A protein has these predicted regions:
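N-terminal cap/lid segment of alpha/beta-hydrolase-fold proteins
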Residues: 4-61
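Short, surface-exposed "cap/lid" segments of acyl-processing enzymes
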Residues: 58-90
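Glycine-rich His-Gly loop
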Residues: 70-74, 143, 168, 212
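C-terminal catalytic histidine-bearing segment of alpha/beta-hydrolase fold enzymes
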Residues: 220, 224-227, 231-254
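Catalytic nucleophile-loop/oxyanion-hole region of alpha/beta-hydrolase
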Residues: 78-87, 98-136
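Alpha/beta-hydrolase
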Residues: 70, 166, 242-245
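Primarily recognizes the serine-hydrolase "nucleophile elbow" in alpha/beta-hydrolase
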Residues: 119-183
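The feature captures the conserved acid-bearing segment of alpha/beta-hydrolase catalytic domains
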Residues: 162, 168, 175, 188-228
Length: 254
């Protein structure tokens, strides 16, 4: 990444304490959990990255509330296992948990990523139907995953009961002139069309928008602007600002 002012403004790692250590720690926690609590692993579609891990509570019988989570990585990095570590806290609450994966840029477009996430959610729900069932669905996403989660919920194809968007990107238009777009290759028109803040949000479920104290200021401002837009659309929305966290370790506080 060339350290231009605009690139730095949209670089979460620039504002983070030690993002590489955080990602390593979270990955290790996920590996440890998988060793202790074997998930159901499913693939959907032809893309090798379109896969999920479904963790089912062992202490309670279904049907269960289901938490689905879409990882970040600016649409071009990481995979579903990056969020496996989150499953432990939801299992402790008696919830099933799914880490969703999707194909990455430049091979996969953002619209295709959304469709893959929809396929993954359907696969998870079908798998749970054979193992006790689902009685409510919460969908979460982090960073780029928050943008994908928004479009999944806005599609109205899956009955989402609550949306949790963490340190998300809600206006993609500034990214067109940044390093992020080297893989995405978005035109200004495409970036506008993919931006949740400019979309019709009237059918969204209740929404929680989470930001970290040490998120990039651009991300924090986007979150505030997005919440204001949702309120204008009469969506039930809560802004949660988590202190002493950055863009990466904010997931530890969920």
């Amino acid at each position: 990444m060339t350290e231009t002012p605009l690139n730095l403004a949209y670089s979460p790692s620039y504002f983070a304490r030690d993002y590489e250590a955080t990602l390593r720690r979270q990955a290790a926690l996920g590996i440890d959990l998988v060793a202790r609590h074997q998930p159901i692993t499913l693939r959907y579609g032809k893309d090798p990255a379109a896969r999920l891990n479904l963790f089912v509570p062992e202490s309670t019988a279904g049907p269960w509330p289901l938490m689905l989570f879409i990882h970040g990585g600016y649409w071009q990095a990481l995979d579903n296992t990056a969020t496996d570590f989150l499953a432990e806290r939801y299992l402790a609450r008696g919830m099933a948990f799914t880490s969703l994966g999707y194909g990455l840029a430049p091979e996969t477009s953002i619209n295709t990523m959304v469709n893959q996430c929809l396929e993954g959610i359907a696969a998870a729900c079908n798998a749970l139907a054979d193992n006790g069932g689902v009685w409510s669905i919460v969908l979460g996403g982090h960073s780029a995953g928050a943008q994908l989660a928004y479009w999944v919920a806005a599609s109205d194809d899956i009955p989402i009961d609550k949306l949790i968007l963490v340190s998300g990107v809600y206006d993609l238009t500034p990214l067109v002139d940044t390093y992020v777009n080297e893989a995405l290759e978005l035109t200004p028109t495409q970036a506008l069309a993919l931006s949740p803040i400019f979309a019709d949000s009237s059918k969204l479920p209740p929404c929680q928008v989470v930001i970290a104290e040490n998120d990039p200021p651009t991300f924090r401002q986007q979150a505030h602007d997005f919440v204001a837009a949702l309120k204008t659309s009469h969506i039930q929305v809560e802004l949660v600002d988590i202190a002493n966290c950055d863009h990466f370790d904010v997931l530890d506080a969920l």
